[in-house]
Amino acid sequence: MSKKILLTFDYELFLYQSGSLENCILKPVQELLSLFDKLNIKGVFFIDILYLKMLRKDGLKEDENKFCKSIHTLVEKGHQVELHLHPHWLDATYESNKKEWNLSNSDKYRLQSLSPTELEDVFTEGYNLLTDVCKQVDNDYKITAYRAGGLCIQPFDVLQPLLEKFDIKIDSSVATELKSESKAHFYDFTKAPKQAIYNFSTDPTVIDKNGQFIQIPIFSYQKKLINKISGKLFGTSGIGNQKFGDGKAVVPQNNVRSSVFSRFKADFYMYSLDGDYDEGLLLRKMKNEKNDIITII
């Protein structure tokens, strides 16, 4: 059975120590676009737009222009540009000696950590900023989808009115089987349906056929002990896994390993071209996936 692959990307700097715009966004995106042009395919880019707010706040005009021009290129080439919000940008500080941002303060990592008024202000500003940038190229451009920063879409009840307000019908924040709880992250998708696309209303992990929202989840696959061993023995774990950029990320804390024996348990990994992945295993899992649509992050 042939598969449809949805290529989605979080268009962002590293979110602990940012690294540079040039190395973390501009160069890798340009490589992607060159490949996409050659293969005649399109991608979905979720733009971490609060970065633009901070560039303007600190008067970093050169980076602002480069960032906006890159988004313009995405729109001009027919790629989908959608909303992505990391509110801990509000506490970020620019380190001029390093020419990068310090985002180590994660108190506001999740939108749900904000007061109701601040949450609405941040969401509204982010939506308007991204819409304005896109309309500089296409006056009819409309944002239709959202991905929560760090996938932290739960609890959804505080975000639902804002998606309704701006007529955003699609969410792509659910990663099946995954769970994380730390100072920065919180999500629990362990009960999410393994369905490529579904409607929901008040809970993005529960199907509601009459729901007004559409969930396009990122699927996960299981890496068993035998896969881990073969990856180590034959050097396949991490093939093609080259790190782009010069920053440091905020790593989600999944199931904490309490003993050495827990290292031998199977783990779940998103269908992803980011982070620690085994290319051969990923391709085999995708080929054997029962769903005919696969979303990759």
Question: What are the residue ranges of the model-derived segments?
Answer:
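Active-site beta->alpha N-cap acidic-glycine motif
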Residues: 1-77, 147
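Hydrophobic faces of well-ordered beta-strands that scaffold small-molecule active sites
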Residues: 5-9, 43-45, 81-85, 144-146, ...
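Aromatic- and acidic-residue-enriched carbohydrate-binding clefts of CAZyme catalytic domains
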Residues: 8, 96-113
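The substrate-binding groove and active-site-proximal loops of carbohydrate-active enzymes
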Residues: 12-24, 50-61, 107-119, 144-152, ...
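Acidic (Asp/Glu)-rich catalytic clusters
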Residues: 32-41, 60-84, 90, 98-101, ...
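CE4/NodB-like, metal-dependent polysaccharide N-deacetylase domain
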Residues: 37-38, 112-150, 208, 216, ...
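Active-site-adjacent pocket scaffolds in enzyme catalytic domains
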Residues: 148-289
